[in-house]
Amino acid sequence: MAKIMIQGTASSVGKSLIVAALCRIFKQDGYSVCPFKSQNMSLNSYITLDGKEMGRAQVLQAYAAGLEPEAYMNPILLKPTSDKKSQIIVNGKVYGNSTAMEYHNLKIKFKDMLKEQFEKLEEDFDIVVMEGAGSPAEINLRDRDIVNMGMAELVDAPVLLVGDIDKGGVFASLAGTMLLLNEGEKERVKGTIINKFRGDVEILKPGLDMLEDIIHIPCLGVVPYTRLQLEDEDGAVEFNKKAYAPIDIAVIKMPHISNFTDLDALKSEEDVSIRFVTSKEEFKEPDLLIIPGSKNTIEDLLYLRQCGLEERIKEYSREGKIIGICGGYQVLGSKIKDPYKVETDLGEIDGLNLLDMETTFEKEKVTTRVSAKLLNEETKNTVYGYEIHMGISKYGENIKPLFKIYDKNGEKVDYFDGAINEKGNVMGTYIHGVFDGVVFREKIINELRVKKGLKKKKSQMYEHMREKELDKLADIVRQSLDMEKIYSIIGMK
């Protein structure tokens, strides 16, 4: 089996999309290929068909490789719960919570498991494309590294180093990274990639030659800055501004926002503009307000209270349309109870009281794939998605369920999910990915269109658009990189 690892000079330099592009290129060239990231830190996660949790970046990479996402592609997932603590997911299941120092001491225990997971891939695939995290030049973490050079050494993988020229200082970041690597690590780096370049490459070439003279490693290509409608896992980036988009959707950007990839399918609607809101001044008068998921619902509820957004949301709810997803759904209720101190020591807290329901946090985490029917007069078509939450919500009298779940991880079930108020303008659900399918997204956006005097439209399947964008990404990267050299590095040609 061939393998190659993509590392970067820093976070958000484009490692994940370079890996996705290589997965698609190798697949197009007839090879069976699999992505692998030993450890990922993200608040955007996904539930596999067998109910396991993994990072969203490896989900996109799996699709690029033509595979169903599986937790073995991302054996360790760290989900920050506060500035100092993270929930640790190992092989798709909750391992526990720990501080950074506690986890640093735990990493040695995971090394054998990671090697074993990787060796299984060697039996099933022609090529494995690995992804590092952050930078390999974090010299304070070198002795227990399991995600960058430590992982590359564990499985004897060659490395390509990616730098982001759009931020500026790409030559310094590449040269500085190489300077901080030890001799064995330097020998693993077989090439560099300049990512997110704007302009004429000819102007850049003298710098590339000088860099090669300094670090003695060839540049394998310059990838242009390109806007793609593919999900971003690393951070809640600003959405592309459209010249004219009559439908204005505001999203509350809470401190612990998670699974904001739920919004990606909405971006595919040509007449929809999405913007983040962090203050009363930014709120304005949107056509729809979305309160997204949260990794610490209680702290984010306190944030809404303290910054004045709670008052503005309640005022907007008199006439405006609101959708809460997972943690955003929980804050819409009358009360949140935390008897086991899952999130804080508060015990319980009043919600926004826009939906007649109460949520209680349990010890066990719900991670499940679901299929549901939308309960309304117009349609009973299926909605697909997944649930990731600690809370159980109970309805009051002045509320109706939004969905009926009929399939859970492949088993037939029969229970309600979500809620909608009597007026029909405030609703919420535990289902992540609820907008990915056409049914719910088309219904909601068409309601907004009609209210503004616009014609209804058919929504496109998000997965079809994603496939086109992945092919576009692969074409750009194939044209930009020396693929013959990359095949030579991995010993395939």
From Swiss-Prot:
SUPFAM superfamilies: Class I glutamine amidotransferase-like (SSF52317), P-loop containing nucleoside triphosphate hydrolases (SSF52540). The keyword Transcription does not apply. Pathway: Cofactor biosynthesis; adenosylcobalamin biosynthesis. The keyword 4Fe-4S does not apply. Keywords: Cobalamin biosynthesis, Glutamine amidotransferase. GO terms for molecular function: ABC-type vitamin B12 transporter activity; catalytic activity. Residues 246-440 form the GATase cobBQ-type domain. The active site is at C326 (nucleophile), H432. One of its GO terms (biological process) is cobalamin biosynthetic process. Belongs to the CobB/CobQ family. CobQ subfamily. Catalyzes amidations at positions B, D, E, and G on adenosylcobyrinic A,C-diamide. NH(2) groups are provided by glutamine, and one molecule of ATP is hydrogenolyzed for each amidation. This is Cobyric acid synthase. It comes from Clostridium botulinum (strain Hall / ATCC 3502 / NCTC 13319 / Type A).
